[in-house]
Amino acid sequence: MASISIRCPSCSATEGAVRNGKSTAEHQRYLCSHCRKTWQLQFTYTASQPGTHQKIIDMAMNGVGCRASARIMGVGLNTVLRHLKNSGRSR
């Protein structure tokens, strides 16, 4: 069985990192026994993925409401509102 050395991003300790459950996206979460911080190696933030902004704008242009867009895209309502608010600005 292969062993992977996991380093705490907060205190840089290589010993004392233990598994601590899973995130809602099913990524392994770790806990540092030295500084008591938690982290995960993979992190998926749906709102920052490429194409999210354009999908939200397209849905708004097709008459889909803000709450429905948030529910369909799997992001928060404030994320949809922020993308719509910033859609007039040049990127």
From Swiss-Prot:
The keyword Nucleus does not apply. InterPro entries: InsA_HTH_dom (IPR024431), InsA_N_dom_Znf (IPR003220), IS1_transposase_InsA (IPR051252). It comes from the Bacteria. Pfam families: HTH_Tnp_IS1, Zn_ribbon_InsA. GO terms for biological process: DNA transposition. Belongs to the IS1 elements InsA family. This is Insertion element IS1 protein InsA. The gene is insA.
